[in-house]
Amino acid sequence: MANPKYKRILIKLSGEALAGERGVGIDIQTVQTIAKEIQEVHSLGIEIALVIGGGNLWRGEPAAEAGMDRVQADYTGMLGTVMNALVMADSLQQVGVDTRVQTAIAMQQVAEPYVRGRALRHLEKGRIVIFGAGIGSPYFSTDTTAALRAAEIEADAILMAKNGVDGVYNADPKKDKTAVKFEELTHRDVINKGLRIMDSTASTLSMDNDIDLVVFNMNQSGNIKRVVFGENIGTTVSNNIEEKE
C-alpha cells in the first residue's frame, strides 16, 4: 500500500452528519456507520482527532435572532457539541478504537478538560481525540475550533466531511447546473473570493499555520481513506499551489 499523504488529521463533521435522513437529532446507526469509516483509517496507523458541530441539536444564531441572549445561545450550542462527541466516542469504542473526549468547558464527570499536551499524548498512543464545547467562548464557530485545534496538535490536514457535497464550487451546484468545481485552491483564493468553506477566522488560521483543507463527500464509503492517501476526490485548499486569477 502507498504511503499516506496525511499522517495526522483532524476530521470536521457537521452536527447534521450525525442526524441521518431526519436532519435533526442523532441517528445512532448513522453515527455507527461513520465510526466504522473512521476506524478503518485509524487501523492503518493514521492519528485522528475530531471536531463535531452541534447544528443537529441547536443553533445559536437563530436563537439569538429570536431574542435569546447571544452568549447564552452559544453556550447552549457548545453543550450540543459535547452530546455529539460523547455519542461518537461511544460508537468508536464499540468498534475497538480507544477514544477520549476533551472539552473546552470543564465537565470532569463526562470528559477530560482540554489540555494540549495530553491530547498529543493520546494521539501518539493511538487514541482518537474528540474536541467538544468549541473553544469555550461564545461567538466562535466549530469551524474555528477545528482550525485552532488542528494548529495546536500540528495536524497535517483538516478533512471537511460534507453531506452529499463533493467539493467547492463557484456557485451552488444544487441551484446552478453550470457550477464549476474547484479541484485546488489556495487559502488566499478562499478568503479573496469569499468562498464559504469555513468562516474567515478559520480560513485565516489554516492559512497562517499552513494546514491543508480537504472538502469531500463523506456519504461515499471509503472517502476518508482516499483523502488520506492523496486521491483527488474533492477540493484541496493549501498554500502550495499557484494563485488562481
UniProtKB/Swiss-Prot annotation:
GO terms for biological process: 'de novo' CTP biosynthetic process; UDP biosynthetic process. Its EC number is 2.7.4.22. Its main location: cytoplasm. It comes from the Bacteria. InterPro entries: AceGlu_kinase-like_sf, Asp/Glu/Uridylate_kinase, Uridylate_kinase, Uridylate_kinase_bac. Pfam families: AA_kinase. Keywords: Allosteric enzyme, ATP-binding, Cytoplasm, Kinase, Nucleotide-binding, Pyrimidine biosynthesis, Transferase. ATP binds at K12, L13, S14, G15, G55, R59, N163, Y169, D172. It catalyses: UMP + ATP = UDP + ADP. GO terms for cellular component: cytoplasm. The keyword Cell membrane does not apply. It is found in: Cytoplasm. Disulfide bonds: none annotated. Residues 20-25 are annotated as: Involved in allosteric activation by GTP. GO terms for molecular function: ATP binding; UMP kinase activity. Pathway: Pyrimidine metabolism; CTP biosynthesis via de novo pathway; UDP from UMP (UMPK route): step 1/1. UMP binds at G54, D74, I135, G136, S137, P138, Y139, F140, S141, T142. CDD domains: AAK_UMPK-PyrH-Ec. Allosterically activated by GTP. Inhibited by UTP. Homohexamer. PANTHER family: URIDYLATE KINASE, URIDYLATE KINASE PUMPKIN, CHLOROPLASTIC. Belongs to the UMP kinase family. Catalyzes the reversible phosphorylation of UMP to UDP. This is Uridylate kinase. It comes from Streptococcus pneumoniae serotype 2 (strain D39 / NCTC 7466).
